[in-house]
Amino acid sequence: MTTLLIYQDTVVLDRGLHRRLKLKPQDNARFAAATHAVPLVAVEFSEAAREYPIVFARGAAEGDKHGELLCYALTGTCEGENLYLDAAGRWNADYIPAFIRRYPFVFAQTGADQLTVCIDETYPGFDDNSGEPLFDEAGEPAALLRSALELLTDFQRQAQLTGAFLKKLDAADILMEAQMRADFPDGRHALVQGLLVVDEAKMKHLSSATVQEWLASGELGLIYAHLLSLGNLSRLAQRMPGSAVTPAPEAPSATTMKKRKGKGAT
């Protein structure tokens, strides 16, 4: 979960250089307009599953090893598309993932165990003259920055816990490749490949000990939240441009998930 995605020009937040910097929150999320998949942490699954398809994918492979397993809320049907923004650039969903909410702040790893707070200088809400200050008169973090640090710290901790869950999920070998296809009456279609989803048939072969362990830890609930969230794929397709004005009898066909056996996506 180290990808920056929505961040354009990150710099270390310096109490000397940025002593007078203020932030005026913007009422839009245009910074995420080109993000078709938003990283999630496991604690978000129950909320996110109500509105987003939760899917898995692999990061870049290292040598002959599979890439790290990651989890995302799917927000578009192709790269560079976010269907959860309205015409004014506002996030159009009840639940906004923490990855989005923490912007324009982010932790950057500057050492083996050292994290440094950074900001995206391109964020239009930063200003020296108006907004809430990041630092107080003594140069200490002001209320806004303290709140941002709390969110960053919690997200980092949850990301580590999520990583441990994903390693278990990967080792259990219960994932399969899948692709999402939405067909429209005018001949258009959307196809998303490289996704991984849990194979319910494979879950039946898990040992009783594993099932009991995952039940006790809450990880089994995460898997079922993921499976239930796949019902949002059709709702995602209906957010595509033009679908809202299509007459009801000719609405896009239900999004289908075509599944292929296999442990990793390409």
Each language-model region and where it sits:
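Short linear motifs in intrinsically disordered
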Residues: 42-46, 96-98, 170-174
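A contiguous, surface-oriented mixed alpha/beta subdomain in the mid-to-C-terminal portion of proteins
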Residues: 106-266
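Short, glycine/acidic-rich beta->alpha junctions
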Residues: 46, 92, 195
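Short beta-strand-initiation
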Residues: 49-51, 95, 101-102, 177
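Short, basic/low-complexity N-terminal boundary segments at the transition from targeting/disordered tails
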Residues: 30-34, 78-89, 158-164
